[in-house]
Amino acid sequence: MKFSRDVTSSRRKQRKAHFGAPSSVRRVLMSAPLSKELREQYKIRSLPVRRDDQITVIRGSNKGREGKITSVYRKKFLLLIERVTREKANGASAPVGIDASKVVITKLHLDKDRKDLIVRKGGKVE
């Protein structure tokens, strides 16, 4: 049963919208929840991830790993995190991409725009 006549419930159209999304929309799709401490401090639940945020992986084979985001790979919907790597066949290390939904933000990289975003979402910046 459809709840809204304005939003399609077609799987085909939802997948097209997701995988054909422009970078500006992918930024919002790549949001992650804040840790409980940050949630109490800023009074918001989640934010789009960005480079230099500190995160903890909470799902998958890399569960428990912590580190700083070195790159947000929007084209593939992945985060590259320092110290989350694997060894290649030739002995070199390669970063492992982690999905934004599998992490929790533990420390925010705050600048003027980020503070404005938190206030706009109804949170508090101290």
Swiss-Prot record:
The role this protein plays is: Component of the ribosome, a large ribonucleoprotein complex responsible for the synthesis of proteins in the cell. The small ribosomal subunit (SSU) binds messenger RNAs (mRNAs) and translates the encoded message by selecting cognate aminoacyl-transfer RNA (tRNA) molecules. The large subunit (LSU) contains the ribosomal catalytic site termed the peptidyl transferase center (PTC), which catalyzes the formation of peptide bonds, thereby polymerizing the amino acids delivered by tRNAs into a polypeptide chain.
Give the chief site where it resides.
Answer: cytoplasm
| An annotated GO cellular component | cytosolic large ribosomal subunit
Name-wise, this protein is Large ribosomal subunit protein uL24
Q: Which InterPro entries match?
A: KOW, Rib_uL2_dom2, Ribosomal_uL24_CS, Ribosomal_uL24_euk/arc, Ribosomal_uL24_KOW, Translation_prot_SH3-like_sf
Location in the cell: Cytoplasm; Nucleus; Nucleus, Nucleolus
Record SUPFAM superfamilies: Translation proteins SH3-like domain
**Organism name:** Schizosaccharomyces pombe (strain 972 / ATCC 24843) (Fission yeast)
Q: Where is this region: Disordered?
A: 1-23
Question: Which superkingdom is the protein from?
Answer: Eukaryota
Q: Which PROSITE patterns match?
A: RIBOSOMAL_L24
Q: Which UniProt keywords apply?
A: Cytoplasm, Nucleus, Ribonucleoprotein, Ribosomal protein
Q: How does it assemble?
A: Component of the large ribosomal subunit (LSU). Mature yeast ribosomes consist of a small (40S) and a large (60S) subunit. The 40S small subunit contains 1 molecule of ribosomal RNA (18S rRNA) and at least 33 different proteins. The large 60S subunit contains 3 rRNA molecules (25S, 5.8S and 5S rRNA) and at least 46 different proteins.
Query: Any one Gene Ontology biological process term?
Result: ribosomal large subunit biogenesis
Tell me its family. Answer: Belongs to the universal ribosomal protein uL24 family.
Q: Where is the signal peptide?
A: none
What's an example of a GO molecular-function annotation for this chain? RNA binding
